């Protein structure tokens, strides 16, 4: 059965909370990209999203792992607040204020995921020296101990129940990643960096992509899985998949992706 994919803006202002069990998602800062002046100048910054374990409390991030807990290094790093992207260094105070508004101090963050290596997405890594880092495909523990992990397009990284990191190449090359959070009040939320710049970007994302073929595939995978997408430079949006009647010819979207209608 074929189907149409429709997207529509998710109402609400930042910080935007999507409660869930065992993880909630909080969009702390909404990214933007706006032309400025003449020529091709753009003022931009990336979205910042917090993933909070339901059982987290300020003391729990610093507890010692129990002997019976068989966890990977990544799963242990995800025991506390997880930050997905950090915006640019010019957003330092806004980021600290947004975290404080959720009762989270920089030292509480146990894992920072950088979706890709652009300055408007990982410009504040220095605020979190005590956190493990997963930037693109590089995973390191505090102090610079790098560990292998095996992430691939057909092999997501499991951080916890319903919490995964996906390889979603394209925009920044072959090493972009996205974070999937299942079990929220709105279904599956995916924080995707610049795989989607914003809702309704079909006519513009290709010009910013290092590998449009790979990114097109990543976008299709995300649209086939997510109920809510947090893009890199715009407001979160819902993804609504609708079954369609049998057709003599397949529906086509404007850019050849999963057929999409924007609400």
Curated annotation (Swiss-Prot):
**Annotated localization:** Cytoplasm, Cytosol; Nucleus
How does the cofactor attach, per the note?
Binds 2 Zn(2+) ions per subunit.
Q: Where does this protein hold Zn(2+) 2?
A: 120-121, 194, 233
Record's Gene Ontology CC terms?
cytoplasm; cytosol; nucleus
Family, as annotated: Belongs to the metallo-beta-lactamase superfamily. Glyoxalase II family.
Give the required cofactors: Zn(2+)
Name of protein: Metallo-beta-lactamase domain-containing protein 1
**Gene name linked to the record:** MBLAC1
Q: What organism is the protein native to?
A: Bos taurus (Bovine)
- Predominant localisation class: cytoplasm
Q: What is known of its domains?
A: Contains four of the five characteristic MBL-fold metal-binding motifs, with two waters completing metal coordination.
UniProt cross-references to Gene3D superfamilies, sorted A to Z? Ribonuclease Z/Hydroxyacylglutathione hydrolase-like
Annotated EC: 3.1.27.-
């Amino acid at each position: 059965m074929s189907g149409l994919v429709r997207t529509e803006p998710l109402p609400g202002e930042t910080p935007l909370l999507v409660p869930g069990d065992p993880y909630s998602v909080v969009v702390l800062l909404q990214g933007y990209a706006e032309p400025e002046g003449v020529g091709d100048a753009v003022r931009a910054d990336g979205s910042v999203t917090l993933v909070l374990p339901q059982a987290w409390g300020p003391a729990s991030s610093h507890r010692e792992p129990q002997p019976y807990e068989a966890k990977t290094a990544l799963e242990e790093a995800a025991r506390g607040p997880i930050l997905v992207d950090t915006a640019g260094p010019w957003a330092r105070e806004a980021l600290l204020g947004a975290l404080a508004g959720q009762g989270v101090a920089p030292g509480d963050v146990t894992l920072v995921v950088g979706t890709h290596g652009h300055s408007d997405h990982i410009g504040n890594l220095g605020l979190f020296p005590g956190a493990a880092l997963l930037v693109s495909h590089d995973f390191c523990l505090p102090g610079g101990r790098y560990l292998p992990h095996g992430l691939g397009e057909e092999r997501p990284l499991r951080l916890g129940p319903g919490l995964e990191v996906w390889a979603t190449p394209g925009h920044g090359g072959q090493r972009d990643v996205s974070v999937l959070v299942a079990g929220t009040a709105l279904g599956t939320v995916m924080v995707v960096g610049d795989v989607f710049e914003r809702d309704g970007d079909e006519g513009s994302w290709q010009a910013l992509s290092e590998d449009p073929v790979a990114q097109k595939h990543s976008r299709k995978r995300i649209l086939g899985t997510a109920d809510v997408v947090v893009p890199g430079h715009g407001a979160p949006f819902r993804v609504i998949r609708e079954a369609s009647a049998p057709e003599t010819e397949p529906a086509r979207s404007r850019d050849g992706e999963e057929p999409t209608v924007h609400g």
